[in-house]
UniProtKB/Swiss-Prot annotation:
One of its GO terms (biological process) is menaquinone biosynthetic process. Its EC number is 2.2.1.9. This is 2-succinyl-5-enolpyruvyl-6-hydroxy-3-cyclohexene-1-carboxylate synthase. HAMAP family: MenD. Its cofactor is Mg(2+); Mn(2+); thiamine diphosphate. Keywords: Magnesium, Manganese, Menaquinone biosynthesis, Metal-binding, Thiamine pyrophosphate, Transferase. Residues 184-209 are annotated as: Disordered. Binds 1 thiamine pyrophosphate per subunit. It is an enzyme of class 2 (transferase). Pathway: Quinol/quinone metabolism; 1,4-dihydroxy-2-naphthoate biosynthesis; 1,4-dihydroxy-2-naphthoate from chorismate: step 2/7; Quinol/quinone metabolism; menaquinone biosynthesis.
Amino acid sequence: MNPSTTQARVVVDELIRGGVRDVVLCPGSRNAPLAFALADADRAGRIRLHVRIDERTAGYLAIGLAIAAGAPVCVAMTSGTAVANLGPAVVEANYARVPLIVLSANRPYELLGTGANQTMEQLGYFGTQVRAAISLGLAEDAPERLDALNATWRSATCRVLAAATGSRTANAGPVQFDIPLREPLVPDPEPHGAPTPAGRPGGRPWTYTPPVSFDQPLDIDLSPDTVVIAGHGAGTHPNLAQLPTVAEPTAPAPDNPLHPLALRLLRPKQVIMLGRPTLHRPVSALLADPQVPVYALTTGPRWPDVSGNSQATGTRAVTTGAPSPAWLHRCEQANRHAVAAVRGQLAAHPLTTGLHVAAAVADALRPGDQLVLGASNPVRDAALVGLDSHHIRVRSNRGVAGIDGTVSTAIGAALAHEAAHDGRTVALIGDLTFVHDSSGLLIGPTEPTPRRLTIVVSNDNGGGIFELLEQGDPRFSDVSSRVFGTPHDVDVGALCRAYHVESAQIEVGELAAALDEPGPGMRVLEVKADRSSLRQLHAAIKAAL
């Protein structure tokens, strides 16, 4: 067995021992040793291999697989720009704390700076965005040292896994594992081959690292009128469950929900912030109010204080006191009023908007389903229409909240969800998000494909979120409609046909029935929506409060 093949097989075996079950592979010549080793592991049923031609979407497919499976996922590619195309996914994985392992094949390092083809300084390319950038030395053709090399390769692979999963830091995230490979890049003929050097007995990892966790208890008195703000990565806090909670869709479902717009009707005396809230301006205003003490509870090491207003930080609350019944009743009434205001104005509004589409999707979900939300308006709309996330799983790329890669994320999340659960996956995304990652629809005929994924495209022909921001002020209409609205006139049905994906254009009133249809496989449901009246609709909702 030649050195590159031996090294690749050892690395793949150790990744599997460390918990990797899904790997995304992009074709190339330099990563051929890894490709052959991964294909062998796939045939043996040890991993599930997903082959993609676009590294950018491959990275987001891996993110979807990782967040839904709760396990590290690798994406392997050849050298050069193939590595650079992982940039957006690596950044998202960094801030969302997703265990993404970039297996970047490289030319031998002595070729750097010589003009060698498809060669660049790719080790360390991702800079501060990765937990670690780790390299293996070139595999030596030294049979007499194979035991020592085997130990070195396996130990390095375990180091990669520990960094990605955060087992020593409680801070999961992306890792670059750069592997220079020398020719020959394909396996030797079998009769002259040799078995892969062995790992630990019983399939154990070479170096086991038990997971560490932070524990920073924070004393909090619940007697003052308190609200909880739960953002992405909030975690569960049973001793806070009785408190009124503004929960973003990706946070754990609250026992005592409080609509984000209800904050306008209340004057809390203190706030407990969980995770990283990013969606609602009333929430941001409350967290920045110097008259309201804020206690921030997070599960990771990042500083959780955008406004500089937090009085203390920790990982869990040690509570004393109890909220007054009068405060709880007042919050319950405010929540009911806000929910009714939103639904009432939706019913009265003459045009279909993204909010209407979000309400139809939210109302059609069933226990066991998984919901993937686009990072622009859809995740906000789901919160505003009162999504009940009990008994469903909600995903959204909230690390840096870009719209890129959302189709691929949804496909990865669906594949992981179906491997462990019976429920469907429904993705709600906007048209720009869909078009931006339309290449994610490309799944080859030999590749694993979601069995129950429906992508709902709320199509208002452009960037609806800008209608609600300062750029959407009517004063700027002569400019904003073009440079922010970015109308595109893409034929969604034709785009889906190009990728052999079933699609249909339906009205919002038909969405619930369409989602209930069994429809095995992956499909797209397009709902035409209007964005020109979004500003008017949101103003009417605020007035109804």
